[in-house]
């Protein structure tokens, strides 16, 4: 995948499971660096899901970003799994997260 992975995540690019699996090592490492940065910012709250704001999430009018489980949950879980594997973190992925950091 010849893209700046983290940047495309910011713009709402949807990564499929196969695309995540096939990321070159360099792209995957860069993505993990970006996730770690978000993990350590003020936008990081009680969970680590804020990094995924651009990936298969929908923004509601009340400032909440929510998962669309009918379409998006498998990819969400897959990318969470990659995050857990890389950082050796185990946590329950929340269904909602505050979006003010991204507005």
Residue ranges and their predicted role:
Residues 96-97:
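Conserved GNAT acetyl-CoA-binding A-motif
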Residues 1-81, 85-93, 102-103:
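Acidic (Asp/Glu-rich) sequence patches and key acidic residues
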């Amino acid at each position: 995948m010849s893209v700046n992975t983290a940047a495309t995540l910011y713009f709402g690019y949807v990564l499929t499971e196969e695309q995540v699996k096939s990321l070159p090592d360099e792209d995957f490492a860069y993505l993990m660096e970006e996730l770690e940065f978000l993990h350590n910012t003020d936008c990081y709250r009680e969970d680590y899901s804020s990094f995924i704001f651009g990936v298969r999430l929908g923004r509601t009018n009340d400032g909440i970003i929510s998962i669309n489980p009918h379409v998006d949950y498998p990819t969400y879980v897959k990318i969470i799994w990659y995050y857990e594997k890389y950082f050796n973190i185990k946590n329950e992925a929340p269904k909602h997260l505050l979006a003010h950091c991204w507005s």
